[in-house]
Regions:
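C-terminal accessory regions
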Residues: 381-438
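Conserved two-lobed SF2 helicase motor
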Residues: 101-107, 359-367
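A short beta-strand element within the Helicase C-terminal
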Residues: 364, 368-385
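Conserved helicase NTPase motor core
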Residues: 1-27, 33, 101, 124-239, ...
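Conserved SAM-binding loop
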Residues: 57, 218, 334
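P-loop NTPase Walker
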Residues: 1-115, 175, 403, 439
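Conserved RecA-like helicase ATPase core segment
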Residues: 7, 197-302, 422-436
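Helicase P-loop NTPase motor core
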Residues: 35, 146, 247-251, 258-356, ...
Length: 439
């Protein structure tokens, strides 16, 4: 369905996403504002009379869950301020946001299983009372043994597998969930597995297997698949996309306009990954003139060093702060490959002037950086002599790392590099960061 809309402007697509009464499958690149779009669509549906209890929003992490709640509240408050006629009704909605079913997939599956467990327990209690003679207690006979065997059998299954099996076997429960959740949203679709997608489709389709009207909103980006190791798991997203393209009441749209990064970064990222990723789609910068004022310098740089990388990192950050004293901890994001290095770099920066709590928000393993961004992103341990196999495994993680930057991307290049192979990314050709000179 994207083909018929290929000449739509990015703005036209966004307007359509906010208000269209369609099932939507969105492929959204980094910095495209998907969280804001999703939140705005939910607000429009709330203003249209949809009850908060009818929404199910699946996020990949607990941090994303909280971010969605805050974004929806933010849009509600903004609407309250400008819409006097609806302000009284919307104020009541604000307090219900925290009670909405906005959760991770694991939490949702556990919730479904708990609903069934409660229902089963109540039914067993009723049966015991009905079967027992007056003055007698029901004996735990063969039925309890069967229950124990079933319990042991289920213990080897993941929570998603148990949930999906339950929905397949208990059609009455599935119908209740379909009735309760008329608006289903799924974020980070590229990192969901086949079982999780099957659960979504079970809820979003009717008894005949047809997609329910205006029920499902899915968003993801295959370039940011970092939690799927096996090739068949990475293929799940594309299989789902193909399936949705064949549905008459599903629209598939691409968003590639980057509102996060400046043109220098966007152009470099496109050039670096266009040949590295299958079916790569270029991003397009969308920045206002005042956007560049948010950071005192801009560009993609390298900083080479010899000796300890922790010392080199501390010296680099100290130089930047000395040159631009107005910068704060929120302007920095420092990314590395491992938990051990994360702690090492935090300790290395302890004398720079940032508090421990500030460093906890600045230094991350790269795979934990999704959803984060900063004016200045420093990539540590860059320039490694990666093998072909290592490169394939790391490419998507490297893409996630560099797309966190808004204005400045710095590769700290030393002697014990682990990723961003110089052979593939041409780091040696980048301008070396020398503060004090005009960049």
């Amino acid at each position: 369905m994207e083909k018929s809309k290929r000449f739509w402007t990015e703005q036209r697509k966004r307007e359509y996403i906010r208000s269209a009464e369609d099932n939507l499958f969105i492929i959204a690149g980094p910095g495209t504002g998907k969280t804001t779009l999703l939140s705005r669509r939910i607000l429009n549906q709330i203003m249209g009379g949809e009850r908060l209890s009818h929404f199910l929003l699946i996020a990949f992490t607990e941090e994303a869950v909280q971010e969605f709640k805050q974004k929806i509240k933010k849009h509600l408050y903004r609407e309250i301020a400008i819409n006097r006629e609806a302000s009284h009704r919307l104020k009541k909605k604000v307090h219900g946001i925290d009670l909405m079913h906005i959760m991770t997939f694991d939490d949702f599956c556990l919730w479904v299983l708990s609903v069934k467990k409660k229902e089963t327990t109540e039914e067993k209690e009723r049966n015991k009372i009905e079967k027992a003679e007056p003055g007698e207690e029901a004996e735990p006979g063969e039925e309890s043994k069967t229950g124990e065997e079933a319990k042991k059998s289920e213990e080897v299954l993941s929570v998603e597998e148990r949930c999906y099996r339950l929905l397949q076997e208990d059609k009455a429960l599935l119908q209740v969930l379909r009735r309760d959740f008329s608006k289903i949203y799924a974020d980070e679709l590229q990192d969901l597995n086949q079982i999780q997608l099957n659960i979504l489709l079970s809820l979003a389709t009717d008894k005949k297997g047809k997609m329910r009207h205006n029920c499902l909103f899915m968003v993801g980006d295959p370039r940011q698949t970092i939690y799927q190791e096996a090739e068949e798991d990475k293929q799940v997203f594309f299989d789902m996309k193909k399936k949705m393209e064949e549905k008459k009441n599903v629209r598939v749209l691409y968003l590639n306009e980057n509102y996060r990064a400046n043109k220098i970064l966007v152009d470099w990222i496109n050039e670096a990954f266009r040949k590295r990723m299958h079916s790569y789609r270029d991003m397009y910068p969308s920045q206002r003139k005042e956007f560049l004022k948010h950071c005192p310098f801009h560009g993609v740089f390298r900083r080479e060093f010899t000796g300890e990388d922790g010392i080199a990192l501390r010296e680099l950050v100290s130089e930047i702060l000395f040159a631009y004293p107005d910068l704060k901890e929120r302007d920095f994001l420092i990314l590395c490959r491992s938990k051990e290095k994360q702690e090492y770099y935090k300790n290395s920066l302890s004398g720079v002037g940032f508090s421990d709590s500030a460093l906890d928000k600045m230094v991350f393993e790269a795979h934990l950086s999704k959803g984060l961004n900063a004016n200045i992103v420093i990539i540590t341990e860059a320039g490694g002599n990666c093998s072909g196999k290592m490169e394939n495994r790391l490419t998507r993680l490297e893409y996630v790392a560099v797309t966190r930057a808004k204005h400045v991307l710095i590769f700290l290049k030393g002697e014990a590099e682990e990723w961003f192979c110089d052979q593939y990314y041409g780091l040696h050709a980048l301008q070396e960061l020398r503060l004090g000179k005009k960049q």
